[in-house]
């Protein structure tokens, strides 16, 4: 009987621990804004949080940013030209969501756009989720 009582207590403690841990992560997630790095109560990054990548020269990331511009041009019947990848953040989901800030050329003018690309490399899948100009008033 004692063995079952100990097993029951251990199971109860595991349930309580699993209930307490997600709420600490959810609190840390709510504390940060979209696009900011979020930290859990133990100081580590929140799982599923948006994190800076910091390697704008990575060929794979540049290719994904070019893909975003090409897909936008197809959907919007536009003629934007990719210039450079300015910054990139990532979020691990069912695959990876990349948040790009991209410099493009529209005629003679250079402009900044934000793009969100969802990639699942094991399925050879990538999809442009969002493509919009950077709000100039937000940078002022």
Swiss-Prot record:
Subcellular location: Secreted
Name of the featured protein: Cysteine proteinase inhibitor 1
Swiss-Prot/TrEMBL site (Reactive site) positions: 48
Lineage: Eukaryota, Viridiplantae, Streptophyta, Embryophyta, Tracheophyta
CDD domains named in the record: CY (cd00042)
Biotechnology and industry use: Introduction by genetic manipulation and expression in potato or banana confers resistance to insects and nematodes.
Annotated GO biological process: defense response
Record's signal peptide: 1-26
Main location as per UniProt: secreted
Entry keyword set: Plant defense, Protease inhibitor, Secreted, Signal, Thiol protease inhibitor
A Pfam family recorded for this sequence: SQAPI
Primary role: There are two distinct cystatins in rice seeds (Oryzacystatin-1 and -2) with different specificities against cysteine proteinases. May be involved in the control of germination by inhibition of endogenous cysteine proteinases. May play a role in defense by inhibiting exogenous proteases such as those present in digestive tracks of insects and nematodes.
Motif placement: Secondary area of contact: 91-95
UniProt xrefs under InterPro entries: Cystatin, Cystatin_dom, Cystatin_sf, Prot_inh_cystat_CS
Family stated for the protein in its record: Belongs to the cystatin family. Phytocystatin subfamily.
A single MF term (Gene Ontology): cysteine-type endopeptidase inhibitor activity
Cystatin domain residues: 48-135
Top-level lineage group: Eukaryota
